[in-house]
Every structure is written in C-alpha cells, then in structure tokens.
Amino acid sequence: MNYSVIMAHLNECGYKVSAIPSTTAEVGFLTVELEINGMPVTLWHIAVTELSKMPSFLLAEPSTLPRLAHTAFYPGSKFASICVNVPDAVSVNFECPELAFEESLKRHVSLLSQALTDSEWNTKELLREFEAGWLNIVEPDIPPFLCLTESETPEELCVLKPSKGSVGLGKYHLGYAEEAVPDNIFSPINQLLKNRQAAKGNGFVIPLSVLKPAPWKKDELTDWYLDLLSELPTNVQTKLTQKFAQKRSYEFWLIFNAQTPSGITWFGIHFSQKNAGKGRKTLPLKHSHLAEWVLEPFIVLTFNKERIMPWSGAEQSLTSKKLCLLDVVP
C-alpha cells in the first residue's frame, strides 16, 4: 500500500501526519499529532500491506490524559486501543485507500473530542462500560463468584468453597442468603449447594446509590474502595459499620451492585489477611486498616432475570406488558 499518497492526502486534509520506519519497512507506523481541548494527543497507526477493514489508530501515552470512555488501556503499555463504533457501512475504494484513512481519522477524532470536551458524557459512557473496565483489572486466574441473591438491600451471605475436582460452576466460590434457598431438594440452587464446605470468611451484599467509573489500574483499588464507602447511603453505611463490620474473619467477600446506563452491574472485592497468624480481624473500613489486607477484584455472576432471560432470546422489558392473542378464522 502506498503510504506516501495516504500521508500526502491526510496532510492536505489538515492533519499533521508523519511516518516512522520499522525494522522491516520504510513506513512501519504513521503518527498523527492533534490538539483537543488544549491537550496534545498523538495517534499511531501500524502499517498494513492492504486494507481488510477500516484503518485503526492507537492512542499514545493515555496516562497523560483524563480517563477516556471507549478506550482500553493495558498496564505496562504506552498505548490504548480506541473502540470506534461503525454505525454506518463504509464503502472502501481499494484504489483510493486514503479516503478510508480520512474517514477513520474523522471518527477517531470525533470520539476523542467528545470525551475530552464533554465530561458528563464521558463519565456516563465510562459507567455504561463499567463491567469491561472492571474486568480489565481482574487477574486472569481469579475465578468468578457465584451470587445466588439479587437483594437491593444490605445482606449477609453464607460463602461456600468450590467443590474439589469440579468444573464449570462447581469451581467457583458461592454466596447465598439463607432465606433465599428454596426447600425443594431438586431445585438447581440446592444442587449447587450440595457437598460444599463453608469458607473461612464472610460475605456481604452492598447496594450502591452512587457508582464511579472502574479503577484504571489495580493499584488504584484501595483508594477507589474508600471513595466508594464515603458515598454509601446513610442506611447502608449504618448497617455496614454497626453490623457487618463487627464480624471477625480471615477473609471477606464484598459484593456490590449498582445501576448503570446499561443496567444493574455486579462486581466484588475479596479481602484476605496478609498475616493470618494474627487471628481474625474485622472488615477494614479505613486506610490505616487496609495495610494488613490484600484486595483482589473479581467478577460476580448472578442468577437473575436480567442476566439469564436474554440468553433464551427473551426481552425483559415485556414483563410489564399485556399480551393479546387473536385467533383468525378463515
């Protein structure tokens, strides 16, 4: 692909584009220097031999900018990928690839401009993609936590260990409220509880009225958790400090749920003592107490209508609708 023509075209369109050679090609990368809302922004494109899709660009040095929605930053990397939605089909003329680059750049710049100039929109979009952001700080070898309650009030959970040698749901920690377990011994829930041992810890469901975007990096989790506690409603704060925080244990599982623009999201933080030999301790609620604990984010899976119904093709918004059946006789 002739990148000289592409560079010339983009420069004519007003972009400041430069080429960087690689070890194998004269043009290994393109860089595009921008200024958005007074902030310098640099985009990188990795050169390809031919176009099979819309050209993509990476955001360089994302840590120098505010946290931006629709970007994925990976610890240790100097770049973030940019998720540019393509609502309209684009016809790519392979004889004129420079037009595809122009269209792609327009979309990248438009997205970044909105994120950097409209903080309210950016925050809303970060909350919409909260689960993706949370997953970004969860270690790959940390299994999900299976929560069998969908309580909208603070609730204590019984936590069970994974079943030895199990696969699938059996290898997850499981939390349930005692009154939420059906008496029917043939129920799927009872089958999940069967032959499991209790964990040496306590679990609590904490509903949130205010949620902030997920931490960008795992080492931000401690401060993010304390900020989360400071925004709790009074009734939740009272139950947390006067009841839950009186429990002593070697480990805790906090299960949070909150409303986001994309629906109710569930996520969790596991607390384990750095030195279990010092005996059981209460749930850490202050920065000074957290020095003795290891915090590990994890994914929460729930058995509720919001998660299960779409798998079968059901639409939850129809639950409050009335259905009229008509029998047409020829």
Whereabouts are the PLM-identified features?
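Rossmann-like NAD(P)H-binding beta-loop-alpha module
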Residues: 329-330
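Defense-system signaling and execution modules centered on TIR/cGAS-STING-like, death/scaffold domains
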Residues: 25-26, 114, 129-134
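Glycine-centered motif in EGF-like
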Residues: 64-126
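Amphipathic alpha-helical segments
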Residues: 1-14
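Compact alpha/beta protein-protein interaction domains typified by the UBC
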Residues: 16-87, 99
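Short N-terminal secondary-structure initiator segments
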Residues: 12-40, 297-323
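Long, charged, helix-prone linker segments
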Residues: 126-150
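Glycine/serine-rich phosphate-binding loop and adjoining beta1-alpha1 elements at the start
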Residues: 143-326
